[in-house]
């Protein structure tokens, strides 16, 4: 039983030693100088907070051409008279200056930089290339002498050396051979002692007896950091400059207005932050290990993906090479065929010319024919020969090679192809799309339209994201609703909530991945469900003056010759013609909304709603040409009715004329404005691109809105004792276009070869 416990204890001890050894090896990376790749020796803290050995820093500055700027840092005493080993016992350490001495020093000009002459206008700025961050850091005029030694890092390096060294005992430096193992060290004397030597060299009753013993070490450091400018102990920390300062630095003009705190406060704050961060890291070791596993998996995936990408690129380039090789063979074949054809023609021409030589070919045959004495036989043979001789003579007189020897027509212009091959590069993700705000709107549904910027890589499909902004925010990241793999450059979002604000964005995707999101666009949905209706011209509309479109969603008033002839027969001073068009749907409950666009060039148009029965009574029997004594309107927006009548009017119209909305004086009595920022009664406001009408049947109210921004223009009471329908009145020329519901738009088709294809 005891042997088992001993074995378990031994195993636990060995595991602990292995863990300590592993942690020490891992920590060793933090203790290596980035220049010499060895343990730090007298490390200096650069302005970029990285560390470098003092000797390495001097060497780097020497390579950069800075000579004489590699002085020792202030924390290491350099004067032989002031070094701890040679300092007189009668001399005590310098104490902090008193406030009155500080004033005298400042008045005498002590605040100038050491080593810098007064009046120097262009001091040399020393730049040091940091080997850790690969950046140039400014050391100031004093070079390395203006840097602090990292004493904490030195102590960590020393503890690390002692922990990993086995049998490396530190020997006494003052013993006679053989020296004993050192048990104490003295920072002032900069030496290690055994017990006997320490007592011998620190006799009782002398100044050296006051030296504080330390653990034995091979590298001695000063007890504290000293100001590089004033050789005083640092007592404060400048948060603005992020630098330790002494009492003299604190009152200098350089730190005027800076946030300066005592070293104790900075020490406690930084220690608390570091402890808190370290505690968090140590408490989440499982998370760290999980993330390490994820990173290792990412490394493996990167290796596999990189190899696949290499193979794909190689395959594509080989494909390009195969196409080029095939094209090369085809072009060479064409040149070869052209060359053989020309050679054949030139060879035939050479043979013809050789036959013209004396005694050979055609000439020899002709000479023999001329020897014939039989006239009929000569004529028979010479007839055909003469034709050949004539052609040969003509060819001789107009000599020209039968084929050109030049192949200029076979030259290739590969400038465009070379440019394409030079610009051949990896596919980039699409750039952020640009939302077309002129074509994007919200009506019965939300229609979103966008386009890619010029010179953007193509997108195979898009992702549309949207969410409501007027709902309480849920804890955690913002949740978006997505529409994946949208083809084309537009999207339709069905059944949006009424009276809400939606924010939408879109991004493209191709084989390279997803691109950046577009800028967010905010859309207001209508305050009520959209009412679908058409224009009804069966009554109250003059076919001579009103033209209704085939789809019954647009109407135009065109005053013509009948109006002029009718006006000429009347003796009144002013003649007006009122034409009315109603919607074919009446509202009997709930809330409804619709929108329309009024032509800005319209003379006078009234857009609104009214009781269907009252509209028929008022307008169906009205004469075509009327005088001012006959008013077809209810008078609610002209102020003609008695203001004391509390009954709601049967009509509610918004008057538009010549690109302006006319808010009559009577509007203030019968119509309530929708807000304190709304228009004032008795004025005009610009006509928006679209007008919206919202009818609340139960409340008996109708609101007129800017259908683009949904800003309220006017709110009026309305008698809703019966069916209420939309109405449009025209006086003079004008036009109205109903906004077509998005859901009823037919899909645009493109006919190709007798087949209909959806666009």
Curated annotation (Swiss-Prot):
Residues 67-98, 623-643 are annotated as: Disordered. The modification Phosphoserine is found at residues 330, 627. Signal peptide: none annotated. It is found in: Cell projection, Axon; Cytoplasm, Cytoskeleton. Zn(2+) binds at residues 227, 230, 249, 255. PANTHER family: E3 UBIQUITIN-PROTEIN LIGASE TRIM36-RELATED, TRIPARTITE MOTIF-CONTAINING PROTEIN 46. Microtubule-associated protein that is involved in the formation of parallel microtubule bundles linked by cross-bridges in the proximal axon. Required for the uniform orientation and maintenance of the parallel microtubule fascicles, which are important for efficient cargo delivery and trafficking in axons. Thereby also required for proper axon specification, the establishment of neuronal polarity and proper neuronal migration. This is Tripartite motif-containing protein 46. It comes from Homo sapiens. The lineage of its organism: Eukaryota, Metazoa, Chordata, Craniata, Vertebrata.
């Amino acid at each position: 039983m005891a042997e088992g416990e001993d074995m378990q204890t031994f195993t636990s001890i060995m595991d602990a030693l292995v863990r300590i050894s592993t942690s020490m090896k891992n920590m060793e990376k933090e203790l290596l100088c980035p220049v010499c790749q060895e343990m730090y020796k007298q490390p200096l803290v650069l302005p970029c907070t990285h560390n470098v050995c003092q000797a390495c820093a001097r060497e780097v500055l020497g390579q950069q051409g800075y000579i004489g700027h590699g002085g020792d840092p202030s924390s290491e005493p350099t004067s032989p008279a002031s070094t701890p080993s040679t300092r007189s016992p009668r001399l005590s350490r310098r104490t902090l200056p008193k406030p009155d001495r500080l004033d005298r020093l400042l008045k005498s000009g002590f605040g100038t930089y050491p080593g810098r002459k007064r009046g120097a206008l262009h001091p040399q700025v020393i730049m040091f290339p940091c080997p850790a961050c690969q950046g140039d850091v400014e050391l100031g005029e004093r070079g390395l002498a203006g840097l602090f030694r990292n004493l904490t890092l030195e102590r960590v390096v020393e503890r690390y050396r002692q922990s990993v060294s086995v049998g490396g005992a530190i020997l006494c430096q003052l013993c006679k051979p053989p020296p004993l193992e050192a048990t104490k060290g003295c920072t002032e004397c900069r030496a290690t002692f055994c017990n006997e030597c320490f007592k011998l060299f620190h006799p009782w009753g002398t100044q050296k007896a006051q030296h504080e013993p330390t653990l034995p070490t091979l590298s001695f450091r000063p007890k504290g950091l000293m100001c590089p400018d004033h050789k005083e102990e640092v007592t404060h920390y400048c948060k603005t400059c992020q630098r330790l300062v002494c009492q003299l630095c604190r009152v200098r003009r350089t730190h005027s207005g800076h946030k300066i705190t005592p070293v104790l406060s900075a020490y406690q704050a930084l220690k608390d932050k570091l402890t808190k961060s370290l505690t968090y890291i140590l408490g989440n070791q499982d998370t760290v290990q999980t993330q390490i596993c994820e990173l290792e998996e990412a490394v493996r995936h990167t290796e596999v993906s990189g190899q696949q990408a290499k193979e794909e690129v190689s395959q594509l380039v080989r494909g390009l090479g195969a196409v080029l090789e095939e094209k090369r063979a085809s072009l060479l074949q064409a040149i070869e065929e052209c060359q053989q054809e020309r050679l054949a023609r030139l060879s035939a021409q050479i043979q013809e010319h050789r036959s013209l030589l004396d005694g050979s070919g055609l000439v020899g045959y002709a000479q023999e024919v001329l020897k014939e004495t039989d006239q009929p036989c000569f004529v028979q043979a010479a007839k055909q020969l003469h034709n050949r001789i004539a052609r040969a003579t003509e060819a001789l007189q107009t000599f020209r090679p039968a084929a050109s020897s030049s192949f200029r027509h076979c030259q290739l212009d590969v400038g465009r192809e070379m440019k394409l091959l030079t610009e051949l590069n990896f596919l980039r993700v699409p750039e952020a799309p640009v939302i077309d705000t002129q074509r994007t709107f919200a009506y019965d549904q939300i229609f979103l339209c966008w386009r890619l910027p010029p010179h953007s890589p193509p997108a195979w499909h898009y992702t549309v994201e949207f969410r409501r902004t007027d709902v309480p925010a849920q804890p955690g990241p913002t949740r978006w609703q997505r529409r994946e793999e949208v083809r084309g450059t537009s999207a339709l979002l069905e059944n949006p909530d009424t009276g809400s604000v939606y924010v939408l964005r879109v991004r493209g995707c191709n084989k390279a991945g997803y691109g950046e999101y577009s800028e967010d666009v905010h859309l207001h949905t209508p305050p009520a469900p959209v009412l679908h209706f058409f224009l009804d011209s069966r009554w109250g509309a003059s076919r001579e003056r009103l033209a209704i479109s085939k789809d019954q969603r647009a109407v135009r008033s065109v005053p013509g010759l009948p109006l002029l002839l009718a006006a000429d027969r009347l003796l009144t001073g002013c003649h007006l013609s009122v034409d009315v068009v109603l919607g074919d749907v009446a509202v009997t409950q709930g809330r409804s909304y619709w929108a329309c666009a009024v032509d800005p060039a319209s003379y006078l148009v009234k857009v609104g709603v009214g009781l269907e029965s009252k509209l028929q009574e008022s307008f169906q029997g009205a004469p075509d040409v009327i005088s001012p004594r006959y008013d077809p309107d209810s008078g609610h927006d002209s102020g003609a009715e008695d203001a004391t009548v509390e009954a709601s009017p049967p009509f509610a119209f918004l008057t538009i004329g010549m690109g302006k909305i006319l808010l009559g004086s009577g509007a203030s009595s019968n119509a309530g404005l929708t807000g304190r920022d709304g228009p004032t009664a008795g004025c005009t406001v610009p006509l928006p691109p679209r007008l919206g009408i919202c009818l609340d049947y139960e409340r008996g109210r109708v609101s007129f809105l800017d259908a683009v921004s949904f800003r309220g223009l006017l709110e009026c009471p309305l008698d809703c004792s019966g069916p209420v329908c939309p109405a449009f009145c025209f006086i003079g020329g004008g036009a109205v276009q109903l906004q077509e519901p998005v859901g009823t738009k037919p899909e645009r088709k493109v006919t190709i070869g007798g087949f209909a294809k959806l666009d």
